[in-house]
Curated annotation (Swiss-Prot):
Name of the protein this chain belongs to: RNA polymerase II C-terminal domain phosphatase-like 4
SMART domains: BRCT, CPDc
UniProt GO MF annotations: metal ion binding; RNA binding; RNA polymerase II CTD heptapeptide repeat phosphatase activity
Region (Disordered): 1-49
FCP1 homology domain: residues covered: 118-292
Organism: Arabidopsis thaliana
Domain notes from UniProt: The BRCT domain is required for interaction with RAP74.
Catalytic activity: O-phospho-L-seryl-[protein] + H2O = L-seryl-[protein] + phosphate; O-phospho-L-threonyl-[protein] + H2O = L-threonyl-[protein] + phosphate
PANTHER family named among the record's database cross-references: RNA POLYMERASE II CTD PHOSPHATASE (PTHR23081), RNA POLYMERASE II SUBUNIT A C-TERMINAL DOMAIN PHOSPHATASE (PTHR23081:SF36)
Textual note on the cofactor: Binds Mg(2+), Co(2+) or Mn(2+).
């Protein structure tokens, strides 16, 4: 494991104690493979290195006027002064299983690294795995209609990297994984703008195996692979363990509720359902892409669309850099991009909300406004769209007479997920009626 070469902290120019220590003591493992014996060797290297570092820092600490603030530890030992400590601070197990940092040190590292990366015109991007970059199924969950896939896979043996291909059979895990179309181009282009993390609710072994499929040469993620075992809150994802300023972090995930504290950083992507088990998991009745022997479009799919959004937010952040960027917030840039999606649209809703509810409090109303639309409760000549579920409502009939667009709520949902205004003709009420009939 090479924290020195791969962690964003060590891409910075700071010469602080943590960076110096990790550079010196973990670099010896940077060229090793990921086999179990090598992990044990890396642990031994850290332990012996810790003893050497302890002697150096003890001498330095003894001549200092102030006491050591114990910025972090390996195991129960401060990596600055060597003093034994109680288990405190935030664990950074994905970097090293014994590593913990206190809040002040985390804040200092984030400040230092963010300043350095911004000089390189880079921000941070945290990426979910399942249904975002790829789709995985257990082999026993394959339908008979999907058995043909087994003859189209690349095989990933335990501990071996594979490059090329998009469908992988992981027999040692009894799994099959399909990479989302455009993912390799997405990662390559995104890496030029962002330091990237993987953050998954899967376990550590699964996370690392998926990282090998996505990044077989170790060019994009290094050790920045965070699993559910590394988080600070169960069943939630948080930026607590990401060493980047929240104002410089964007997140790509298919599940909004996974990030309750960081929704302003989040880009929600349409879920990738390649396998039938994925559709069943979310109670979708339509056939999966594998059953249809189809797939998303490379140039026009979800990842290609999101890449455009990332480029827009990145460009806005670094616009007019001569004016200074230290106080800029990429979350505001993301909101600015969203505001352009339905800009110029004025929407009236017809029997979409519960009768006694305040329309302006409904999530769909708020979503439309976040996308740049103006919402109203009454129709007039300036209205461009009526969102309804029944063409027989008074407002829907008015829209037809006045040659305004009548669409169902899916038009707004699609704009939200796809980050672009959608053709109204694809979301008419006749299409909705047909869809509901097919699902019955």
């Amino acid at each position: 494991m090479s924290v020195a070469s791969d962690s964003p902290v060590h891409s910075s120019s700071s010469s602080d104690d943590l960076a110096a220590f990790l550079d010196a003591e973990l670099d010896s493992a940077s060229d090793a493979s990921s086999g179990p014996s090598e992990e044990e060797e890396a642990e031994d290297d850290v332990e012996s290195g810790l003893k050497r570092q302890k002697l150096e820092h003890l001498e330095e600490a003894s001549s200092s006027k102030g006491e050591c603030e114990h910025p972090g530890s390996f195991g129960n030992m401060c990596f600055v002064c060597g003093q034994k400590l109680e288990e405190t601070g935030v664990s950074f197990r994905y970097i090293h299983k014994e590593m913990r940092l206190n809040e002040d040190e985390i804040s200092r590292l984030r400040d230092s690294d963010s300043r350095f990366l911004q000089r390189q015109r880079k921000l941070y991007l945290v990426l979910d795995l399942d249904h975002t970059l790829l789709n995985t199924t257990i082999l026993r969950d394959l339908k008979p209609e999907e058995e043909y896939l087994k003859s189209h896979t690349h095989s990933l043996q335990d501990g071996c990297n594979v490059s090329g291909g998009s469908l992988f059979l992981l027999e040692f895990m009894q799994m099959m994984t399909k990479l989302r179309p455009f993912v390799h181009s997405f990662l390559k282009e995104a890496s030029e703008m962002f330091v990237m993390y993987i953050y998954t609710m899967g376990d550590r072994n699964y996370a690392r195996q998926m990282a090998k499929l996505l990044d077989p040469k170790g060019e994009y993620f290094g050790d920045r692979v965070i699993s559910r075992d590394d988080g600070t809150v169960r069943h939630e994802k948080s930026l607590d363990v990401v060493l980047g300023q929240e104002s410089a972090v964007l997140i790509l995930d298919d599940t909004e509720n996974a990030w309750p504290k960081h929704k302003d950083n989040l880009i929600v992507i349409e879920r990738y359902h390649f396998f039938s088990s994925s559709c069943r998991q979310f109670d979708h009745r339509y056939k999966s892409l594998s059953e249809l022997k189809s797939d998303e479009s490379e140039p026009d799919g979800a990842l290609a669309t999101v890449l455009k959004v990332l480029k827009q937010a990145h460009a806005l952040f670094f616009e007019n850099v001569d004016e200074g960027i230290s106080n800029r917030d990429v979350r505001l840039m993301l909101k600015q991009v969203r505001k352009e999606i339905l800009k110029g649209c004025k929407i009236v809703f017809s029997r979409v909300f519960p009768t006694k509810a305040k329309p302006e409090d409904h999530p769909l109303w708020k979503m439309a406004e976040e996308l740049g639309a103006t919402c109203a409760t009454e129709v007039d000549a300036s209205v461009t769209h009526v969102v309804a579920m029944d063409v027989g409502t008074e407002k829907a009939r008015w829209a037809v007479r006045e040659k305004k667009y009548v669409v169902h709520r899916g038009w707004i949902d699609a704009a939200n997920y796809l980050w672009m205004k959608q053709p109204e003709e694809n979301f008419g009420l006749e299409q909705l009626k047909k869809q509901l009939t097919e699902e019955e």
